[in-house]
């Protein structure tokens, strides 16, 4: 649709203008009406177009996509002391009661809070560190520290940490890398936003809490739509990757060292290779453009939590 409208615009507007020819009112009216009808048709039949694209995906891949989407809806909460709760409910009586019961049972806990990539990290812990019996996450979508979101209040997180500082053995944090690139694609890093994260983490460290800051994860930028279909047909899962996320990782390494913050680069550990790390034995390691799938949380988490640097930070204190 975009290409068709662009062609009409070029043929009947841009071309004549370049040749300094006037456009008749009739052609102008026809062009406007045609563009409107094309856009309207696209809007009306968007579901049919989407279904056509889905049908175009080979059946074996469609089954994998359906499985991945279904698993991504799982909420990993064991009903005991691996607690998965929203930031909005951080002061709810039921959550706080459960917290106190688990404190009596296990003592100190591993705490995570933030956005959807923190959720990926929590799920990876749930699936790869069975000996961690007391783990809490408070999370929200669209939770960048610089973005005002009533469902993601960093002051609530800091207040919770202040109230429970003697019982938090570690605080884990991570974030999506593209949120800290200028214009999403980079290549420049939006350093002032990363510096806001540093300030947030330093406030937690001031409570004498051990913090591990995990860098961004690879972003193949493949949605489960035409991008996936195109990648499959080209047998190339690197067509849309946001490679400049590595610039964010490098800057985070730099400022974490300057501020004495323990930092783990997921990029350095995973060494993501789309040829072998995206589609593995009929499993997709990502559920969308940047979030790990259930399989990916196990697959990448296993690499991270068995890395030497994680073991040094987490087990040797």
Predicted regions and their residues:
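Extracellular/periplasmic envelope-modification machinery, especially enzymes
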Residues: 1-7, 11, 15-317
């Amino acid at each position: 649709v975009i290409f068709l409208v662009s062609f009409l615009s070029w043929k009947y507007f841009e071309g004549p203008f370049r040749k300094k020819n006037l456009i008749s009112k009739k052609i102008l009216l026809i062009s406007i009406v045609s563009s409107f009808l094309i856009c309207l048709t696209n809007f009306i039949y968007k579901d049919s177009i989407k279904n056509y694209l889905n049908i175009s995906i080979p059946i074996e891949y469609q089954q994998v996509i359906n499985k991945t989407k279904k698993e991504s809806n799982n909420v990993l909460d064991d009903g005991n002391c691996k607690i998965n709760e929203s930031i909005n409910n951080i002061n709810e009586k039921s959550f706080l009661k459960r917290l106190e019961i688990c404190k009596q049972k296990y003592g100190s806990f591993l705490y995570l809070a933030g956005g959807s990539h923190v959720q990926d990290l929590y799920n990876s812990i749930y699936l790869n560190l069975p000996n961690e019996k007391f783990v809490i996450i408070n999370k929200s979508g669209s939770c960048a520290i610089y973005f005002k979101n009533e469902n993601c209040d960093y002051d609530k997180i800091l207040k919770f940490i202040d109230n429970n500082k003697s019982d938090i053995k570690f605080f884990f944090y991570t974030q999506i890398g593209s949120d800290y690139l200028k214009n999403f694609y980079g290549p420049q890093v939006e350093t002032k936003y990363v510096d806001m994260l540093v300030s947030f983490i330093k406030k937690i460290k001031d409570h004498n809490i051990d913090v591990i800051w995990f860098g961004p994860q690879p972003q193949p930028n493949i949605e489960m739509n035409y991008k996936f279909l195109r990648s499959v047909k080209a047998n190339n899962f690197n067509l849309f990757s946001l490679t400049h996320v590595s610039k964010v990782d490098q800057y985070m390494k730099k400022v974490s060292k300057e501020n004495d913050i323990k930092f783990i680069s997921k990029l350095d550990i995973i060494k993501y290779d789309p040829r072998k790390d995206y589609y593995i034995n009929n499993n997709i390691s990502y559920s969308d453009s940047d979030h790990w799938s259930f399989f990916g949380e196990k697959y990448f988490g296993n690499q991270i939590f068995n890395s030497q640097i994680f073991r040094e930070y987490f087990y040797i204190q």
